[in-house]
């Protein structure tokens, strides 16, 4: 049996911004844009160090060689392709203070990414609170990507 790819997630570290956030591929298709925003919105609700406000849709020609952009062009339009960027040094907490990343906080982000997949695909156990160590509502403006024309 052949399975269809539904989502591609490329994970990178970065040194010039705090938090974790995503780059998504730009699209003019409103329905596809809304679908693309779902995974980052869910991760934002599951992870205190993820910033939906910093998440951007991007079609920068300099990024043509990235996995997200290359696979976005090669695969069917229904496949969501993301780059998850994670800071080398810190996230910003609800009081706008920098909180240094530790091995534990990186592991917590990984756990929250897994929980987000469970939420996205409505997998059994996704609502089980024993798996959820931290959730938040830090970002009040969840209406649009930071630079991509989604709303």
Task: Kindly give the residue locations of the regions a language model identified.
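Structured catalytic-domain cores with a bias toward divalent-metal coordination
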Residues: 1-151
């Amino acid at each position: 049996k052949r399975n269809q790819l539904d989502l591609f997630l490329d994970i990178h570290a970065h040194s010039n911004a705090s938090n974790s956030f995503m780059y998504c591929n730009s699209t003019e298709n409103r329905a596809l844009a809304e679908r693309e925003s779902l995974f980052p919105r869910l991760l934002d609700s599951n992870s205190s160090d993820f910033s939906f406000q910093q998440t951007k849709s991007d079609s920068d020609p300099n990024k043509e060689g990235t996995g997200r952009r290359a696979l976005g062009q090669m695969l069917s339009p229904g496949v969501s392709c993301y780059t998850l960027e994670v800071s080398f040094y810190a996230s910003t907490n609800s009081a706008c203070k920098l909180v240094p990343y530790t091995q534990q906080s990186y592991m917590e982000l990984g756990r929250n990414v897994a929980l987000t997949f469970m939420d996205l695909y409505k997998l059994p156990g996704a609502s089980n609170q024993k798996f959820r160590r931290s959730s938040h509502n830090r970002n009040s403006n969840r209406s649009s990507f930071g630079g991509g024309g989604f709303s």
